[in-house]
Amino acid sequence: MIKVLFICHGNICRSTMAEFVLKDIVRKDHMEAEFFIASAATSREEIGNGVHHGTLRKLHEVNIPVDKSKRAVQITKEDYNIYDYIIAMDENNLRNLKHIIPEDT
């Protein structure tokens, strides 16, 4: 199984959108059993909050299903050992990510 984790600042917009877009692609290709896809934040600001209304609206516009129970979580050091791919949404998140996970990233 390929495990993918998308990372942004708050885990309510970009990383969440990337998570649901990739899940939709994988579902349409009938490959759900081959992937585990999630998203997380580098900050604690939005922890526990749901997906941003703008993100929900855009995903709805392009008919991408959203798990409305999704809540923002923060990446942990342990995630580095769980996921095959950790994808930061921009340079700032990559920099912050390097403070959280091991040196060899």
Question: Where would I find each of the regions flagged by the language model?
Answer:
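Glycine/proline-rich loop-helix segments at beta-alpha junctions forming the active-site rim
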Residues: 60, 74-105
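Conserved active-site segments centered on acidic
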Residues: 1-82
